């Protein structure tokens, strides 16, 4: 297993106008992250990859393409979580066979699962695959909140490495870091990189890193070095960019920014809006000129 600390892009996926996977474009996005953004790794199959609108076979195809293009140049994490446990296991086995360094799985959602059911879900994926696991906690989308003691229960399984922490509860983040110093935490909110890094997170996984990965690393490393003033200046610029991206449409705007750099980033998958309006394309060009030139 490679070192899983550091800056990981939550990988975007390029789709054709008919919704099919654009393999050429996906390969270009992988290469852009490696060659231009200089990320430490990729988090494949997450929310940014429009994962929860895809079939099992499409998810496998994305895992295959990303691994084939990245090879062993960087670390790879496969997000295999699903409300269907058997699908999660099938995906986990496939990604493990491909050589992914660790699995990750979003907490099972929609139904109000009990904590014992959630623990069984993670333990089952690990037992079936033999791979490592990173809990993906994103309570504002799943409605699932896991407390400090419950994380301790999950961490009793030695294959659970830590958590992708996509939440604004920095008190919980600090408590987890103190209670379980040997387990890793990846910050999941790009706009809060500095405060997360100041609390000692081990890395970050972000959607905007596909185009803003260099600044993300600067914030992370400056904060680790105690250079908070310099880190804050870069966080301010980063958040100005993120504010513009969010106002314009998160995934489509990041894809447009990639297109402006020659990457065939494609469309989004319906029922999301497939492409930006001309006005929003023009705004993306303004963001590119102001923040990414």
UniProtKB/Swiss-Prot annotation:
One of its GO terms (molecular function) is N-acetylneuraminate lyase activity. Pathway: Amino-sugar metabolism; N-acetylneuraminate degradation; D-fructose 6-phosphate from N-acetylneuraminate: step 1/5. It is found in: Cytoplasm. Pfam families: DHDPS (PF00701). Keywords: Carbohydrate metabolism, Cytoplasm, Lyase, Schiff base. Its main location: cytoplasm. The active site is at 136 (proton donor), 164 (schiff-base intermediate with substrate). It is an enzyme of class 4 (lyase). This is N-acetylneuraminate lyase. It comes from Pasteurella multocida (strain Pm70). The gene is nanA.
